[in-house]
A protein has these predicted regions:
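Soluble catalytic regions of membrane-associated enzymes that act on cell-envelope
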Residues: 518-639
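Short acidic/proline- and small/hydrophobic-mixed sequence motifs that coincide with surface turns
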Residues: 66-71, 130, 152-156, 606-609
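Bacterial N-terminal signal peptides
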Residues: 8-19
Length: 735
């Protein structure tokens, strides 16, 4: 009987696993949530096309903690198959407890690689990664309108409107027979102040054709946001203003953009007679025939019984015309705006404003400022098909004007090979040919001396060991001569070379500038390349002279800088910089009637190797124009005529290439031809083939600014040369 309890215990233990489960292991502690939250998107919205250049990514950092949070935001653009050469930009953040902060990060598309994968990482002040947020980006090249209204009601009517355009920066981008739609974008607004969150560098507008803004918002802008917008307009952008209050017209910024204080007038009858532009089906709109400015004011009867009058389409780079026949009446009723829209319309004049088919328009630098006679942001204008068509036409016109600019703000080359000529012009190694020739001569002499001559002496003296004694001497002498020649040509220390192109409107002092900065070092060296000013952006053009392909763009209050660059000895690193520049004076281009043009130099410097192109006539060469000097185009040496310009295509639009072979015309002496070709060939190669260097409707002045001020050092290296070139477009200025 004593064994029964033991057997019972054994039986219980045997079945225990099926009737009893041990307590489950405690779950691992949940990961600690990050102390901040991050949201990132392109500054004009995640659906807005940013084009194939620079753009801003707006990052909102929310801090729900009871203590301030600070660290670094890092944006990375890379391709899955080529993660060794990403684009990286960084900016610090510091968010007080319970607050929200907005941080702008710079980005650009990858040459020959599209948008790539864009991510924003947040790190704390110790470098630990907190968050990794993907950023959707649309890099389509489209005519984009940014509507700075809150909310934007025009987007419903205009988004995807088939654009009737001819110009394309990439001729095959839209296929055969297809038509791109107008891209629509709108900025975010600061929840605390109600102000729009706009780019603080003009490169942030790289993918934008036109900006629509009420004047009460413009008058509130200040600091970097205002400077970026104005610089973008001066560089070729189009700003459409909706006057909201009488006092806005007296604002200094508004007056400066209009060339003087504007004031309201009755709506021009010709504007009211403009026909309604129906929404295209995708095949485009037929443009009426162009009539010369001399015919302004005439009226005539069309074949269909419609009566017409003439209205200029645009200021045409500071000059009125060409003019467009406008239908004023047609059997079946008016084609103008609705009566409710007309009742609220007003015209404007004053300053340099000219009445055009888009509104009262002034030229500002290379860009345009349009004072709209209607308000497209609210009823009745926003619901009027006539208003919708006018705005669409304005965006299309703004897009077409981009063809006249060699380096539009925020643009980057479509192909990396385009900068090869620029790299060669900035590379001291390209000047090593004399050194190579000297080395070849030294080696030839060495081979003769150490060979036949030394052995002949040995035979004459009967000393068979003489070559063994003298050969090392001749070898050391030849080696030393070659090394000294190499050091003499390449230099004992590093140095920098620079080349810039300033594009500017006639009569204006602010223009857009594209700088190429070459850095040549004699040793492995860590470089930090800072921007010339806080409004410029930087990027590495060629990495042949870099030990590591990775570099990052650091953004702070003082501007941007490329860091983490380690250069290789005797190699050249080239950096591209985009910004704006204010010249000490302007270059005036004055219409003297017919095909006559006078050019007046107010820059304070001598203009060297000047080319003055007169539309419909020819390009004329002048060796120099002194400060304060005036030349008449007809008195120069003819390089080529308008009929002999080299033509190309950009989409379905005809453009005219720079073609340095025509600048280096046989009518010039050989030294001048070589200098002109060496100066302008790198610029021609760096610009896309879609540039209309010699427009049909605007004069162009090309020149080198002789004696331009430049820094003595660049990123710690001596500046060996700094060439500043000018391209002046349009009419304007004073004697």
């Amino acid at each position: 009987m004593s064994r029964l309890p033991a057997l019972a215990t054994a039986a219980v233990l045997a079945i225990a696993p099926t009737s009893y489960a041990a307590p489950a292991a405690a779950p691992p502690p949940a990961a600690k949530p990050p102390p901040i939250s991050v949201a990132a998107a392109p500054i004009f919205g995640q659906d807005a096309p940013v084009g194939s250049g620079w753009y801003d990514v707006l990052v909102r950092v929310d801090n729900p903690q009871a203590t301030a949070q600070k660290g670094v935001l890092e944006l990375r653009v890379s391709q899955p198959w080529d993660n060794e050469r990403p684009f990286v930009s960084r900016a610090p953040y510091n968010v007080p407890a319970g607050k929200t902060a907005y941080v702008r990060l710079l980005a650009h598309s990858l040459p020959e690689g599209g948008s790539g994968e864009v991510h924003v990482k947040a790190r704390d002040d110790k470098g630990a990664e907190l968050l990794d947020v993907p950023v959707p980006v649309n890099t389509a090249d489209l005519p984009v309108l940014v509507d700075v209204h809150e909310p934007s009601r025009l987007s419903v009517a205009l988004r995807g409107w088939p654009a009737s355009i001819r110009y394309s920066p990439t001729p095959t981008a839209w296929g055969y027979g297809s038509t791109p739609g107008i891209g629509f974008a709108a900025p975010s607004f600061d929840r605390a102040t109600g102000d729009p969150l706009l780019p603080e560098r003009k490169a942030g507008y790289g993918g934008v054709a036109a900006v629509l803004m009420p004047t009460d918002v413009l008058t509130r802008l200040q600091g970097d946001a205002l400077d970026a917008l104005v610089s973008w307009v001066a560089g070729g952008g189009t700003l459409a203003l909706v006057p909201m209050r009488p006092e806005d017209l007296r604002n200094p910024t508004v007056a400066a953009l209009a060339g003087g204080e504007p004031h309201p007038i009755p709506t021009p009858p010709a504007l009211l007679a403009l026909p309604t532009i129906p929404r295209p089906s995708g095949t485009g709109i037929t443009v009426p025939p162009v009539i010369e400015p001399e015919d302004e004011g005439i009226g005539f009867e069309g074949e269909t019984g419609a009566s017409f009058q003439l209205l200029p389409t645009a200021p045409a780079h500071g000059r009125r015309g060409p003019f467009l026949p406008i239908s004023t009446s047609r059997r079946g009723g008016s084609l103008g705006p609705r009566p409710a829209t007309v009742a609220k319309m007003s015209g404007y004049e004053g300053g340099s404003l000219v009445q055009t088919a888009h509104g009262a328009t002034s030229t500002y630098g290379l860009g345009e400022v349009v004072f709209l006679s209607y308000d497209p942001s609210q009823a009745p204008g926003v619901d009027d098909p006539w208003v919708q068509g006018r705005v669409a036409s304005l965006v299309e016109h703004a897009w077409e004007r981009r063809a006249n600019i060699a380096f539009p703000p925020g643009s980057i080359p479509k192909h990396s090979w385009r900068t090869d000529e620029m790299r060669r012009s900035l590379d001291p190694n390209e000047n090593f040919r004399p050194g190579l020739g000297f080395a070849a001569i030294v080696l030839a002499i060495y081979s003769v001396v150490v060979g036949p001559i030394t052995f002949m002496r040995s035979r004459k003296k009967g000393d068979p060991l003489l070559p063994l004694r003298w050969a090392p001497v001749w070898s050391a002498a030849a080696f030393g001569a070659i090394v000294i020649a190499g050091l003499a040509v390449k230099g004992w220390t590093g140095r920098s070379r620079r080349m810039s192109l300033v594009e500017i409107g006639a009569g204006f002092t602010r223009g857009t500038i594209r700088r190429y900065r070459g850095f040549f070092t004699s040793e492995t060296r860590a470089l930090k390349v800072g921007a010339t000013d806080a409004a410029s952006v930087l990027d590495v053009v060629t990495g042949d002279g870099v030990l590591r392909p990775r570099s990052s763009l650091a953004v702070d209050r003082d501007g941007v800088a490329l860091d983490e660059i380690t250069s290789l000895p005797w190699q050249t690193l080239v950096v591209r910089e985009d910004g704006h520049v204010d010249l000490p004076g302007s270059i005036a281009v004055l219409d003297t009637g017919g095909s006559g043009i006078d050019v007046v130099n107010h820059t304070g410097k001598v203009l060297k190797d000047v080319v003055v192109y007169v539309p419909g006539d020819a390009a004329h060469y002048f060796a120099a124009i002194p400060d304060g000097g005036t030349v008449s185009a007809a008195s120069g040496t003819v390089l080529f005529t308008s009929a002999t310009r080299r033509a190309g295509s950009a989409g379905s639009r005809i453009v005219h290439t720079l073609d340095v072979t025509t600048l280096a015309s046989p009518v010039l002496d050989e030294v001048t031809r070589d200098r002109m070709e060496a100066t302008w060939r790198p610029v021609e190669s760096a610009a896309d083939e879609s540039v209309d260097w010699w427009p049909d409707d605007a004069p162009v002045v090309l020149a080198e600014l002789d004696g331009a001020d430049h820094p003595r050092t660049d990123s710690g290296l001596r500046v060996e040369s700094d060439k500043v070139l000018l391209r002046v477009v349009g009419y304007g200025g004073a004697r």
